[in-house]
Amino acid sequence: MFMILRNVGKKLSRLEQMNVNSKNTVLESLIEKSDDKELVKNRFNRLLNSFVIPPVSIDPKGIIVKLEHILNTQEDNMKDEIQLMTKDLDDVEISILMNLVEVSLGINLMYKYIRHFYISGKKTGNMMIIAQIQMILPQIMEQAEAYNAAIPSLKSKKPIGDGIGPLVASKLSGESESKEVVRDTILNEITIENRNAFIIKAKGPGGNVGKPGEAIKKVVEDKKDISLIITIDAALKLEGEDTGEVAEGIGAAIGGPGIERYKIEEIATNNKIKYLAIVTKMSEKEAITEMKTEIEKSAEILLTKVKETIKQHSKDNQNIIIAGIGNTLGVK
């Protein structure tokens, strides 16, 4: 037991170090944009200790609507806090600071949970608690290291791996006119392979993910005759798979809490619309850090796959939707 405790203790020390570093880095970024250092410190500490209570799931009916409302409230609250702490920032700067705060919140939460079980195990002498921590620690540490590496990437404002979907959507849209159809989400109308294509992505170049599900729902309801929906996104690779590998599948390629995917599935099912997915494989760390060359190069393969899919699964003059899913940091 002593050896296990020592091993867990070392990992906990590393987590604590990452937690302190992330807090200091994000705090410095906020202070740089503010005139009131003490205000920033106090408000930032409040944010770090904030929490979200999920809706009751005993009766699952309507839980998606409740969850969406809670998450929208959380996002609005964080945006208000950032605006309160800083001065005269545009939407791009605010979204990047929000991303940085969210990363710091994630590392802080991981550290506090591991610390809790470590202390509980030592206090009670319960070997099972310590053994369980040891089993999950490799995954926790991998995720924490990924979050820690994301901070300089976010500060640099360069595209991250998760931005591959918006990057492809941007390449497809070219110089066509875009309009914001729902919150932080834009739509471009183009012609591709003799089809009328509606290109959807989050609004860049800030660190937004938008509401692609809501945007797709709106387009389908407005047009009524959509024949195909294609989602393009980053996907978590399995060990042994190559970064930048492209794969095709059925369904909606979109992560997160499930709200946007639910909307895509619901509208596609109700209207009998075929919905397909094309993804680029990458690790969690590669998804939230500066976009690797292998991932960037996969954009051309994705473009080819999109055109092939359009030809195979739709006909001339039909209306289709192509959604680039992911974080638009550094992608216009």
Where would I find each of the regions flagged by the language model?
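Active-site pocket-shaping loop/turn-to-helix segments
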Residues: K292-I295
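Terminal transmembrane helical module of multi-pass membrane proteins
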Residues: K297-L303
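Short hydrophobic beta-strand segments
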Residues: N319-G324
